[in-house]
């Protein structure tokens, strides 16, 4: 008896497994200090770690079908690659200082390619309170010292980001424990090979602009050698690390794009020459009731499949519009895309369409049934309608909040009718109004609306979700009419002219749909406080 290792067969339609990107392992970090060809090498990896989904173009998963095809292995790496007993046996991204990708930067109009010099330069700039950018596994990040208020405020200006909190990369788990409360489940997630951002209750402050007004802090640990190299040269316990793009745009992956967006705003952009084929943001997780709940599923998780308990072959679900992901059905598995974002941004919509095509190609997917949101003006719904017309396929419209309820039923294996409380932002209802605070009697196929929050005006439509004071005025006007008992300081904070304009809009019914949204109720209450 024996076995043979043979070349990968070409194409198969039964593909559902592609590995997500994996944080660098301890063995590879050790190799950077002990192997001559990998001393301080920033792209070290093995069969147990390194880039996967971010570099793959096609299947089967061979180097020639990844962006590593641009780099020919040196004899030493080739020997590891073909040796069955080696940790780098058939590790497709295997590389070293002699043959692999490398970092480079243009600083003061001079190209710098020496990694040690780049490390010293970037560390000095971070120490001096500058904001820099660096290309990582799934895209560019913007980085600064998390203790330096001036640097973090400058980062907010660059990102055009008002109050949304930033994620923080900590030196190690001990420093995380100094700044936040964490339990065993949370630390297990932080230390896992997936390396997500984990939302934790803050214990000590960093710079105020990191997470203004928040009690939680998004924390993660180093997952690339570059991260560890910075902390070896810096005294700070933590760095702000946020996606390297202007707010609402997709994470940047191309050096020329990064330079166009950021040159002149920051002193240094660290590029590397390994192309990113599939952009992936950092994943975000929160532990609720002892269970890990993914808030944003991307790097480290995508494209791992979910297993359904019913056949889903051929279903292509296009997702919603605001925080979009889409999904493909293969057999009894569901393949969900990486986090896409808000499709109203043109660049994000282009990323969405590109990812739709790439997922279908990668997983040899041929749709037979299309599914989209009930809202006809969502760009995802319009894309679904285009597919239906071009491919002559049936299209099923699904009410937004029933989709939420059905997703929970699938996640928890529920197939009997349930009473579902769906508390959400917005979604078009069957009656043409904006739903979001619903009680359904439903199963996975059908639902009956038992009750809902009272309808109130939604002045300005979508604008009310970004200007919460509008909903405060709407609720107060709805219940008190023109004799509104505004909270102390509310008029001064918002402005009398704005309030009067909104009251006239609601009285005349101009751009004022009605909503039962729980999210807008929360907005109203928070704006009154």
Model-derived regions, located:
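Short acidic/glycine-rich loops and adjacent helix/strand connectors
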Residues: 1-529
């Amino acid at each position: 008896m024996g076995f043979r290792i043979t070349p990968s067969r070409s194409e198969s339609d039964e593909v559902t497994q592609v590995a997500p990107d994996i944080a660098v392992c301890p063995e590879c970090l050790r190799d950077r200090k002990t192997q001559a060809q990998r001393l301080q090498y920033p792209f070290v990896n093995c069969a147990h770690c390194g880039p996967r989904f971010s570099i793959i173009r096609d299947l089967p998963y061979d180097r020639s079908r990844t962006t590593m095809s641009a780099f020919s292995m040196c004899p030493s790496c080739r020997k590891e690659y073909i040796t069955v007993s080696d940790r780098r046996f058939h590790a497709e991204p295997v590389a070293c200082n002699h043959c692999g990708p490398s970092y480079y930067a243009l600083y003061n109009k001079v190209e710098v390619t020496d990694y040690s010099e780049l490390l010293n330069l970037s560390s000095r700039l971070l120490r001096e309170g500058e904001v820099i950018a660096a290309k990582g596994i799934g895209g560019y990040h913007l980085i600064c010292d998390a203790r330096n208020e001036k640097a973090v405020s400058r980062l907010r200006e660059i990102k055009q980001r008002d109050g949304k909190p930033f994620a923080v990369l900590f030196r190690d788990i001990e420093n995380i424990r100094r700044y936040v409360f964490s339990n065993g489940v949370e630390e297990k997630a932080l230390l896992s090979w997936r390396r997500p951002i984990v939302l934790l209750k803050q214990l000590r402050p960093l710079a105020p602009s990191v997470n203004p007004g928040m009690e939680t802090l998004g924390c993660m640990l180093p997952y690339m050698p570059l991260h560890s190299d910075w902390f070896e040269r810096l005294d700070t316990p933590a760095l702000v690390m946020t996606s390297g793009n202007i707010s609402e745009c997709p994470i940047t992956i191309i050096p020329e794009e990064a330079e166009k967006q950021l040159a002149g705003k920051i002193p240094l952009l660290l590029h590397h020459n390994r192309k990113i084929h599939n952009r992936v943001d950092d994943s975000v997780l929160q532990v609720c009731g002892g269970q890990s709940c993914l808030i944003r599923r991307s790097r480290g998780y995508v494209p791992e499949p979910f297993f359904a308990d019913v056949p889903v072959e051929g279903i292509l679900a296009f997702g919603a519009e605001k925080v979009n992901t889409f999904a493909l059905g293969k057999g009894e598995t569901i393949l969900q895309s990486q986090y896409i974002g808000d499709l109203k941004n043109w660049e994000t919509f282009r990323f969405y369409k590109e990812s739709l095509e790439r997922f279908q190609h990668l997983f040899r997917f041929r749709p037979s049934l299309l599914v989209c949101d009930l809202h006809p003006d969502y760009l995802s719904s319009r894309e679904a309608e285009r597919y239906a017309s071009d491919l002559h396929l049936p299209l099923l419209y699904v009410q937004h909040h029933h989709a939420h309820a059905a997703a929970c039923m699938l996640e928890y294996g529920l197939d009997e009718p349930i009473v579902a409380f769906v508390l959400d932002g917005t979604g078009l209802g069957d009656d043409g109004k904006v739903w979001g605070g619903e009680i359904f009697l439903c199963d996975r196929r059908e639902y009956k609306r038992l009750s809902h929050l009272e309808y109130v005006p939604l002045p300005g439509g979508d604008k009310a979700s970004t200007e919460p004071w509008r909903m405060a005025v709407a609720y107060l006007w709805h219940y008190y009419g023109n004799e509104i008992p505004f909270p102390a300081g509310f008029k001064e904070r918002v402005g009398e002219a704005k309030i009067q304009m909104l009251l006239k809009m609601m009285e005349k019914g101009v751009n004022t749909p009605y909503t039962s949204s729980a999210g807008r109720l929360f907005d109203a209450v928070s704006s009154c406080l």
